[in-house]
C-alpha cells in the first residue's frame, strides 16, 4: 500500500470527515466507493492515534460502521429470484449511510450560507440615534410617556376584564337593556380621574360589569386618548395600565359633551 499522507484538518464529526473524503476523492455520494473511503478514513483515525490525539468515540463507531459495510460489500451477491408473485432485490448496505451524508451536507451548506450572510451583515455599521429630547415641547414629552402602551395592550387588558366578568357573573341573570352614550361616558371618566387626583388604574374605570357599559367605557377611553385628554402608562409588560388626565383640553371636551 502506498503511504497515505493525512492533513489534520478540523472536523465537526465523523460525517464531516466522510464528506470531506468523498469530496476530496471526487466521487458520487450516491455511489460511494466504500473500500477506498474506508481505507482513507481508517488512515486518518490511525494518524490521530499515533499523534496521541484524543479520538472521540463517535469516530470509532463510524469506523466500525464502515468496516461492516465494507465486509457486506465483499460478500458474494445472492442470485435475484423472480417469479410471478414475488420479486426480491438485495438491499444496498450503503443506503443508510448515503442518506445520512446527504442530510448532513444539506445542513452544512445551509449553515455556510448563514455564516456568509452574517459576515456580510457584520460589515454594516449603524450609528446610535441622536438624543433630541432638548428640542421636545412639554406636550411631546408627555406623549413619549405612553410609548410602551399600544392599542394591543389596551385590548389585552380589556379582554382580561371580560374573562373576569365571565367567571364572576351568575349562571342565570336578568338581561337589562340600557343605552350608554360615549360622550357622556367620556365626561364621567374625566370626572372620575379628577376625583382620584388625575390618575387611576385601567380596570378601576370599569366599575359596572354590564357588557354594554364596558364596551362604551373602552370606546370612550380611546376617544379621550385620541383627543389627548388622557394618556396611559405601563411600567412593564403585563403590569397594570394607569390612566392619567391631561389638563387644558378637558374642559372643552366636557362642554362639548354636555351640549349634545
From Swiss-Prot:
Quaternary assembly: Component of a cohesin-like complex composed of ScpA, ScpB and the Smc homodimer, in which ScpA and ScpB bind to the head domain of Smc. The presence of the three proteins is required for the association of the complex with DNA.
Record GO biological process: cell division; chromosome segregation; DNA replication
One Pfam short name: SMC_ScpA
Keyword NAD in record: no
InterPro entries given in the database record: ScpA, ScpA-like_C
Subcellular location(s) of the protein: Cytoplasm
UniProt lineage: Bacteria, Bacillati, Bacillota, Bacilli, Bacillales
Keyword Cytoplasm carried by entry: yes
Keyword tags: Cell cycle, Cell division, Chromosome partition, Cytoplasm
Role: Participates in chromosomal partition during cell division. May act via the formation of a condensin-like complex containing Smc and ScpB that pull DNA away from mid-cell into both cell halves.
NCBIfam families noted in UniProt: PRK00104.1-4 (NF000995)
Native species: Halalkalibacterium halodurans (strain ATCC BAA-125 / DSM 18197 / FERM 7344 / JCM 9153 / C-125)
GO CC aspect terms: cytoplasm
Family: Belongs to the ScpA family.
Protein's name in the database: Segregation and condensation protein A
PANTHER family named in the record: SEGREGATION AND CONDENSATION PROTEIN A
Gene3D superfamilies in the record: 6.10.250.2410, Structural maintenance of chromosome 1. Chain E
Amino acid at each position: 500500500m502506498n503511504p497515505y499522507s493525512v492533513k489534520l484538518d478540523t472536523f465537526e464529526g465523523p460525517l464531516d470527515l466522510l464528506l470531506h473524503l468523498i469530496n476530496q476523492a471526487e466521487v458520487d455520494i450516491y455511489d460511494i466507493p466504500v473500500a477506498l473511503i474506508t481505507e482513507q478514513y481508517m488512515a486518518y483515525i490511525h494518524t490521530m492515534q499515533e499523534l496521541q490525539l484524543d479520538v472521540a468515540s463517535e469516530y470509532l463507531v463510524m469506523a466500525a460502521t464502515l468496516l461492516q459495510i465494507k465486509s457486506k460489500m465483499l460478500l458474494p451477491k445472492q442470485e435475484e429470484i423472480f417469479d410471478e408473485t414475488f420479486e426480491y432485490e438485495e438491499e444496498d448496505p450503503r443506503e443508510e449511510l448515503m442518506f445520512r451524508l446527504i442530510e448532513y451536507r444539506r445542513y452544512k451548506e445551509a449553515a455556510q450560507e448563514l455564516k456568509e450572510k452574517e459576515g456580510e451583515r457584520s460589515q454594516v455599521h449603524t450609528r446610535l440615534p441622536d438624543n433630541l429630547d432638548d428640542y421636545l415641547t412639554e406636550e411631546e414629552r408627555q406623549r413619549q410617556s405612553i410609548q410602551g402602551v399600544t392599542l394591543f395592550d389596551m385590548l389585552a387588558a380589556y379582554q382580561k376584564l371580560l374573562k373576569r366578568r365571565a367567571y364572576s357573573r351568575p349562571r342565570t341573570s336578568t338581561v337589562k337593556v340600557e343605552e350608554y352614550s360615549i360622550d357622556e361616558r367620556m365626561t364621567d371618566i374625566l370626572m372620575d380621574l379628577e376625583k382620584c387626583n388625575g390618575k387611576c388604574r385601567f380596570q378601576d374605570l370599569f366599575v359596572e360589569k354590564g357588557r354594554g357599559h364596558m364596551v362604551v367605557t373602552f370606546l370612550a377611553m380611546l376617544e379621550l386618548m385620541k383627543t389627548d385628554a388622557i394618556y396611559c402608562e405601563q411600567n412593564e409588560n403585563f403590569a397594570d395600565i394607569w390612566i392619567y388626565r391631561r389638563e387644558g383640553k378637558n374642559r372643552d371636551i366636557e362642554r362639548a359633551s354636555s351640549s349634545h
